[in-house]
Amino acid sequence: ENFSGGCIPGYMRTADGRCKPTY
């Protein structure tokens, strides 16, 4: 489980620490 930002694949870590889709 080496996801960047600790999010699932296809998601990115936002400035407020949440994970949101990149699409």
Swiss-Prot record:
Domain of life where this protein originates: Eukaryota
Tissue note: Hemolymph.
Pfam families: GBP_PSP
Keyword Disulfide bond: yes
Function summary: Causes rapid, rigid paralysis when injected into Lepidopteran larvae. The physiological role may be to reduce hemolymph loss following injury and promote wound healing.
UniProt record similarity statement: Belongs to the GBP/PSP1/paralytic peptide family.
Listed name of the protein: Paralytic peptide 1
Native source organism of the sequence: Heliothis virescens (Tobacco budworm moth)
One annotated GO molecular function: cytokine activity
GO CC terms of this entry: extracellular space
The keyword Heme is assigned to this record: no
Keywords: Cytokine, Disulfide bond
Annotated S-S bridges: 7-19
InterPro entries: GBP_PSP (IPR003463)
